[in-house]
Amino acid sequence: VKEPETVSRFLGKFSFRTTQMIRNVNFKLFKKLLDKSRLKSIIIDIDSTVINVEGHQEGTAKGYNPEKPGNRCYNTLMAFCNELKAFITGFTRSGNTYTANGAAEMIAEIIENLRDSVDTITFRMDSGYFDENIIKTIEGAGYCYIIKAKQYGNMVDKLYRGDPLQWAEYDNCKEIAEISMRPDKWERPRRFVVV
């Protein structure tokens, strides 16, 4: 392995255009893998992770960091194909970046690149991505999503203020119910499944 400074100098020469070219090559490789699999329906998991750093590297900031609270870090947004266990795309952000920042744009890029390769895409995300802009991006392209909703007090109130929920047994020990509601500041109601 070369000295870290050599790698750092090499990576320092990358421009936005260079990194975008690398991301495009990655999409082409993933599409070949997807075409070879002949899958017509896929689940894409969107998530972020923290990369700890020591010192004051460019682009780092103090943010959510469960391993080393108060330490500077990067926050990396990534997308994986569940069926193929394969990385699709991602990018690194400053450590103090909110989880959902850039996710709608990344999802739009995924859709643009994979639209001709699969019939159905279901995007799966945790509550950090419970954002109407993300949902509108997915719905606008005609795809599906599963996003864990944040348990805001006003949403929980809406669950119990309206008509009683019709609960159905699920998985021998759980019950589920459906409700359509519009979270505050959202343009229209959405379907929620309560477990």
Feature locations, PLM:
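Active-site-proximal, Lys/Arg-enriched surface segment
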Residues: 4-78
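Electropositive, glycine- and tryptophan-enriched low-complexity nucleic-acid-binding patches
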Residues: 66-116
